[in-house]
């Protein structure tokens, strides 16, 4: 049983390691698609503790500041489209430097638990990829 679980774990790791890095255009379209899913592109959107263009929580702002090693972002920055994208890229730069789109969406939807739980955030990934593919097809 342990061998099967180890093999399955290695397969999941292998899939993540072989993921293609998104181009700048693909990455920007992915961010657009996440924002469409999260807030309908509304930088003033609010849903409980989640605020702004990318629906950022206070916990995420704190994590971005921890990564930056200083207080670079404020809670009000969540209302700025540009600062929201910068926070998204800060998180992804630390935890997803390979710009794997599946992992990017799962981290955004489920949090850092997605790094260990490969099913976390999969529903959001499927929903966002529908938006993404539609958006890319319109270009």
Predicted feature residues:
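N-terminal targeting signals for Sec/Tat export/insertion, comprising classic cleavable signal peptides
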Residues: 29-61
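Short, functionally critical alpha-helical segments immediately adjacent to catalytic or ligand/cofactor-binding
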Residues: 26-42, 88, 104-111
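Secretory-pathway/luminal and periplasmic proteins that interact with or process carbohydrate-rich
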Residues: 39-45, 112-122
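Short, solvent-exposed mixed-charge patches
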Residues: 138-139
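Sec-dependent N-terminal signal peptides
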Residues: 4-13, 19
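Alpha-helical segment that forms one wall of the substrate-binding/catalytic cleft
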Residues: 58-116, 124-134
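Cleaved targeting-peptide boundary
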Residues: 18-27
